[in-house]
From Swiss-Prot:
Lineage per the UniProt record: Bacteria, Pseudomonadati, Pseudomonadota, Alphaproteobacteria, Acetobacterales
Gene: rpsJ
Keyword match GTP-binding: no
Protein name (Swiss-Prot/TrEMBL): Small ribosomal subunit protein uS10
Keyword annotations: Ribonucleoprotein, Ribosomal protein
Membrane recorded as keyword: no
Native species: Granulibacter bethesdensis (strain ATCC BAA-1260 / CGDNIH1)
Gene Ontology CC terms: ribonucleoprotein complex; ribosome
């Protein structure tokens, strides 16, 4: 593939699973002869929810919950056809959202 980059964005709620998947992608790409830029940690998106503790009274008593979405960015520079085949066959952990752009 001539002068193309593959940009991979990974998202997960658990940063350990995300880092393991990132390492797996980097090792696969390097093994097949491609250069890798990254992993670049992107800002963590924190979504907070505030709810009343009681269903009836006591508005002042509240509880807060949050969901943290961790993100990583990888650029694979000058991928070979073997790199693309290996990445297509790669089986990543459940819970990791992968978005690929050419």
């Amino acid at each position: 593939m001539d002068n193309q980059n593959i940009r991979i964005r990974l998202k997960a709620y658990d940063h350990r699973v995300l880092d393991n998947s990132t390492k797996e992608i980097v090792n696969t790409a390097k093994r097949t002869g491609a250069r890798v830029r990254g992993p670049i940690p992107l800002p963590t998106h924190i979504e907070r929810f505030t709810v009343n503790r009681s269903p009836h009274v006591d508005k002042k008593s509240r509880e807060q919950f949050e969901i943290r979405t961790h993100r990583r960015l990888l650029d694979i520079v000058e991928p070979t056809p073997q790199t693309v085949d290996a990445l297509m066959k790669l089986d990543l952990a459940a819970g990791v959202d992968v978005e690929i752009k050419l």
